[in-house]
Amino acid sequence: MVNQQPELHSQISINGSIIIVVCHQGFMSAKDKFHDVVKIALQKEGWQITDDPLSISVGGVDMLIDLGAERLLAAERQGEKIAVEIKSFLNTSAITDFHLAVGQFINYRTALKFKDPQRQLFLAIPLTAYNDFFKREFTTAVIEDYQFKLLVYDVEQEVISLWKK
């Protein structure tokens, strides 16, 4: 018999965005409204969601890649395979969100090289964050230096505004 721990639910409001946090068997997952926006936008473009979230285990490190209010999606379309790390950039400090996103992106990309090398990793960011923060000289330099692929999404229209490879 498996000893099942009860789920604990908590609701947090940050800058008007509601985040539902679910703790279950020692793992914490959180999901904000932008997860579903990106998922819908990908499906509108013909992508099939294959993993939600994408679980990766590399070298003794397990990544459920479902951190904070973000979630990693895996999708396929006509033989193409992608993974998408979704960020909302809702905190008052965009640079703090950026530091977290850069670290996660590098870790996830390295893990994918081990476990699923044909899958391309994209960082999904809202159109407002792209226009307000990601066009700055420093941010652009980091994106270019680390060869990030961006997926820019429109929260209101639930569409992908830009694929930047």
Region roles according to the model:
Residues N3-N15, K149-K165:
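Charged phosphate-binding loop/patch that engages nucleotide di/tri-phosphates or the phosphate backbone
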